From Swiss-Prot:
One of its GO terms (molecular function) is protein histidine kinase binding. The keyword Heme does not apply. InterPro entries: AHP1-5/YPD1 (IPR045871), HPT_dom_sf (IPR036641), Sig_transdc_His_kin_Hpt_dom (IPR008207). Binds to the msc4 response regulator which is part of a multistep phosphorelay system that transmits oxidative stress signals to the spc1 MAPK cascade. One of its GO terms (cellular component) is nucleus. It comes from the Eukaryota. It comes from Schizosaccharomyces pombe (strain 972 / ATCC 24843) (Fission yeast). It holds the Pfam family Hpt. The modification Phosphohistidine is found at H221. Residues 182-284 form the HPt domain. This is Multistep phosphorelay regulator 1. The keyword Zinc-finger does not apply.
Amino acid sequence: MSVYRDNMYMKYDRNFENRVARRNGQARNASLAKTLHDSGIAERARSPSGSAIPHAYRVMNGSGANDTSLPLTSNPAYVALTSRISSSKSENNQQLAANETAGAPEGTEETVDISNSISDDHANAKNLPAASVKALVGAGVLSDELSVIAYDMSFEDELIQDKQLIDHSVFDQLLEMDDDDEHEFSKSIVWNYFEQAETTIADLQKALEAKDLKKLSSLGHFLKGSSAVLGLTKMRKVCERIQNYGSLRSRDGVMKLPSEEIALDLISKSLSVVNDFYKDARAYLLDFYEKNSST
């Protein structure tokens, strides 16, 4: 009975792992398709003849996207993809990703149709063949390295579109510890956070200049934790991103980044986002205490 049960568990585990791997693959393809569209690469890959892959290869190759003599950070496709950091504000990107990943029959190979991602100006179905990002990567339109960058950038809208600067379910727990209407206790915690955050952001800049990835990861982890205590949602997310980049991982920690050069470049771009989110959080909290103080 024990052997039978163990075999059943092993079979279940394998089936579960296969389903998870399939879902992850589908999500990655959808993320890549969305990101390619948002960066304009999918648009350039469109072929009037209906033959997307060779056409895309010629176009991207002609633009220098596959020029291996170029540093990856100077690659036109890389520049197009990473320009989305803190700049892409399309309202329908999250829904697009959800639509792309939904409803794939189990056991089938996922092919992501990017035709629905193209602007209405080009919505001629005959000219918009379904094309999987896997095929684009396989054909040399995007290198494996660039596919990792595209995967990572596909999370950008989640951070930008999140309107929740502060999670009040967390912050209000801190306020409940105040003994008076002056909020002296919570205010001391918040003011201490301001000092810590400003010092840490300055240290992050120094670590970036020194190209110290280990230090960058550690500082990102520290600021993520202190931001989480106050319920500063956006600060927590962007600091977690820096923590993972410093460990040579994608922002969600799933994929390995191609090089230290890429990690440092992504951290550099993310630091400007940290500064913006910190200023927003600081202004919000100062205003909150000004309005909610009895004096």
